[in-house]
């Protein structure tokens, strides 16, 4: 009897520790600024994210990436713009990625941390400790 109780406890503990139970960051996310919505997907072994819409895009669907520090990129439309790339790790934290911010045209080193099934924390840094953190909410 003791063996079956211990075996059951071990199975439950293993299931609770399983990465399969960790929240999946893929999906559509609401940003806290400018009504932005970003779709996070798997791109090979990494996570990437694309800007789907924002207040600026809703006002002008042809809004361009005018603040990009790379002049050759300024003609891109904001809709469909790659914002997140190269994040690896998991199951609850992904590091080593890049975050592009169309508001200032800068690209920053980033970390994505799942803080719940429907929330994540995105941290972008020029150089630590010069970082900014946002909490995003899952839409779907």
Across the structure, where does each feature detected by a protein language model lie?
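Positively charged n-region of N-terminal signal peptides that target proteins for export
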Residues: 1-5
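Bacterial N-terminal signal peptides
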Residues: 7-15
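Sec/Tat signal peptide C-region and signal peptidase I cleavage site
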Residues: 18-22
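Central antiparallel beta-sheet cores of small beta-barrel/beta-sandwich binding domains
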Residues: 25-26, 32-103, 107-108
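Short, exposed beta-strand-loop hairpins at the edges of beta-sheets
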Residues: 104, 109-113, 119-133
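Short, solvent-exposed mixed-charge patches
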Residues: 139-140
């Amino acid at each position: 009897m003791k063996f079956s109780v211990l075996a059951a406890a071990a199975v439950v503990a293993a299931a609770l520790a399983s990465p399969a139970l960790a929240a999946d960051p893929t999906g559509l996310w609401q940003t806290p600024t400018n009504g932005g919505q970003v779709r996070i997907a798997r791109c090979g072994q990494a996570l990437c994210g694309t800007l789907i819409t924002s207040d600026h895009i809703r006002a002008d669907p042809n809004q361009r990436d005018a603040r990009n520090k790379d002049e050759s990129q300024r003609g891109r439309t904001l809709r469909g713009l790659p914002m997140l790339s190269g994040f690896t790790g998991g199951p609850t934290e992904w590091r080593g990625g890049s975050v592009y911010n169309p508001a200032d045209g800068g690209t920053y080193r980033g970390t994505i941390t799942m803080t719940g099934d429907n929330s994540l924390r995105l941290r972008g840094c020029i150089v630590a400790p010069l970082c900014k953190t946002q909490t995003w909410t899952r839409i779907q």
